[in-house]
């Protein structure tokens, strides 16, 4: 008497940034298409895949900790992702891992899974169809759209190019077709991500591709114009401050894409920016920000900064605080500089900033920016906004406005039971705000 073979089961842990999350989605989509079941616990899995982060040393430590936990709880572990480029470091700590690959090695990861637990030979892909948009790890109403891999910059604090390589842009027709599938599947917000969104198409000389029979240039402006036709919110992340950023501001002013720019300025002191190998035109940047806001008064600018970079003096730090006062950024994150193995900054020969000074500067930075963010949100009280509902709880609903990217920005809280569902878009009036969040009432 024949018995039906057991369905092979895979556990999956995804660490790091949204780019890594998209890599995880792609691997999981392929495994699901081959009949694998994705399970939420180590003990139920036949094998566990850990997609690691290797951006900074604390992320590497977390990756090694999670790998160790998976080995302890399951025993069969496959490692991939950015830290995977350091196979020796991983095997030194965890010699029993079955396979180690770097980022974007989708086929190698799937093959490694095959070796541990082969797919069922009798699997019929028509019985358990994977949706056209693939497996998504985000809530159903928003999704990350990765438009390129790698980066052509050589920022001295960063090792991303050594892990993910030089810029490789995806064909714009392929990107737009994916976005179209996402919207048809119910996605209300598309978050455009890459290592360097404004450089999209540079590597292919902005060549023309085709989407639904019409020509589209492989360039940020044309991509945004096409995405705006799909009827979803379009939010731009990781936008390097090239001159071509100016070109998309009119689209924001016209309401075609969200008036939101995520631009990692990193610092303002010309001396520190030079050491970081970042653009050192902070005065010109202030003029551009002013111009952007004149064209699009609703524009929200998010950024990230590093304090305590080698050689940063108190004068440099005060320059940064003064620049923040001038720039009046809306959403800001800040990190204390952490040396990364293999980063060029380690070889600059600059004085290290003591840890207690880094902490003190971080505290001052956050207090300074919180006051700016709070004042800017106070100006929103009484105004009407559209809110995308993320969660519905007993006390009310939690959503986001065009001000807020998921996970990294604030929320909009709506008290009471209004029958909303995740993914609903609701017209509201803002009634209160603090440094990060807003409270609103439906209109």
From Swiss-Prot:
Binds 2 [4Fe-4S] clusters. One cluster is coordinated with 3 cysteines and an exchangeable S-adenosyl-L-methionine. Its EC number is 2.8.4.4. It catalyses: L-aspartate(89)-[ribosomal protein uS12]-hydrogen + (sulfur carrier)-SH + AH2 + 2 S-adenosyl-L-methionine = 3-methylsulfanyl-L-aspartate(89)-[ribosomal protein uS12]-hydrogen + (sulfur carrier)-H + 5'-deoxyadenosine + L-methionine + A + S-adenosyl-L-homocysteine + 2 H(+). Residues 137-375 form the Radical SAM core domain. [4Fe-4S] cluster 2 binds at residues 151, 155, 158. GO terms for cellular component: cytosol. It is found in: Cytoplasm. Its cofactor is [4Fe-4S] cluster. InterPro entries: Elp3/MiaA/NifB-like_rSAM, Methylthiotransferase, Methylthiotransferase_CS, Methylthiotransferase_N, Methylthiotransferase_N_sf, NA-bd_OB-fold, Ribosomal_uS12_MeSTrfase_RimO, rSAM. [4Fe-4S] cluster 1 binds at residues 17, 53, 82. Residues 8-118 form the MTTase N-terminal domain. GO terms for biological process: tRNA modification. It holds the Pfam family Radical_SAM. GO terms for molecular function: 4 iron, 4 sulfur cluster binding; aspartic acid methylthiotransferase activity; metal ion binding; protein methylthiotransferase activity. Residues 378-443 form the TRAM domain. Keywords: 4Fe-4S, Cytoplasm, Iron, Iron-sulfur, Metal-binding, S-adenosyl-L-methionine, Transferase. SUPFAM superfamilies: Radical SAM enzymes (SSF102114). Catalyzes the methylthiolation of an aspartic acid residue of ribosomal protein uS12. Belongs to the methylthiotransferase family. RimO subfamily. This is Ribosomal protein uS12 methylthiotransferase RimO. It comes from Pseudomonas entomophila (strain L48).
């Amino acid at each position: 008497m024949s018995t039906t073979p057991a369905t092979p089961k895979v556990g999956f842990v995804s660490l790091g940034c949204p780019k890594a999350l998209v890599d995880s989605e792609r691997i999981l989509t392929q495994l699901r298409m081959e009949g694998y079941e994705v399970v939420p616990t180590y003990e139920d899995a036949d094998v566990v895949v850990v997609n690691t982060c290797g951006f900074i040393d604390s992320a590497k430590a977390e990756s090694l900790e999670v790998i160790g936990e998976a080995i302890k709880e399951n025993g069969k572990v496959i490692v991939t992702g950015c830290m995977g480029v350091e196979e020796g470091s991983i095997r030194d700590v965890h010699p029993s891992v079955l396979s180690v690959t770097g980022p974007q090695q989708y086929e190698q990861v799937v093959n490694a899974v095959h070796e541990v637990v082969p797919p069922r030979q009798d699997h019929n892909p028509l019985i358990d169809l994977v949706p056209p948009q693939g497996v998504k790890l985000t809530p159903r109403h928003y999704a990350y759209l990765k438009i390129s891999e790698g980066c052509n910059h050589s920022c001295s604090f960063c090792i991303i190019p050594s892990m993910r390589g030089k810029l490789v842009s995806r064909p714009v027709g392929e990107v737009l077709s994916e976005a179209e599938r996402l919207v048809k599947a119910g996605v209300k917000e598309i978050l455009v991500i890459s290592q360097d969104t404004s450089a999209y198409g540079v590597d292919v000389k902005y060549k023309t591709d085709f989407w639904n029979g019409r020509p589209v240039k492989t360039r940020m402006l044309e991509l945004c114009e096409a995405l705006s036709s799909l009827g979803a919110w379009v939010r731009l992340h990781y936008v390097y401050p090239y001159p071509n950023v100016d070109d998309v501001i009119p689209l924001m002013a016209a309401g075609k894409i969200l008036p939101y720019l995520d631009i990692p300025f990193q610092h303002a002191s010309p001396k520190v920016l030079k050491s970081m190998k970042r653009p050192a035109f902070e005065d010109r940047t202030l003029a551009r920000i002013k111009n952007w806001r004149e064209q699009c008064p609703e524009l929200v600018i998010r950024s990230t900064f590093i304090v305590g970079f080698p050689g940063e003096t108190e004068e440099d730090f005060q320059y940064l605080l003064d620049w923040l006062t001038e720039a009046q950024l809306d959403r800001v994150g800040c990190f204390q500089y952490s040396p990364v193995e293999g980063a060029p900054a380690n070889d600059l020969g600059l004085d290290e900033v003591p840890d207690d000074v880094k902490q003190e500067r971080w505290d001052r930075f956050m207090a300074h920016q919180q006051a700016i963010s709070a004042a800017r949100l106070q100006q929103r009280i009484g105004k009407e906004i559209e809110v995308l509902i993320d969660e519905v709880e007993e006390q009310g609903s939690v959503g986001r406005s065009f001000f807020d990217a998921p996970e990294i920005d604030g929320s909009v809280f709506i008290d009471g039971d209004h029958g909303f569902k995740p993914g609903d878009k609701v017209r509201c009036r803002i009634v209160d705000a603090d440094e990060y969040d807003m409270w609103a009432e439906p209109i």
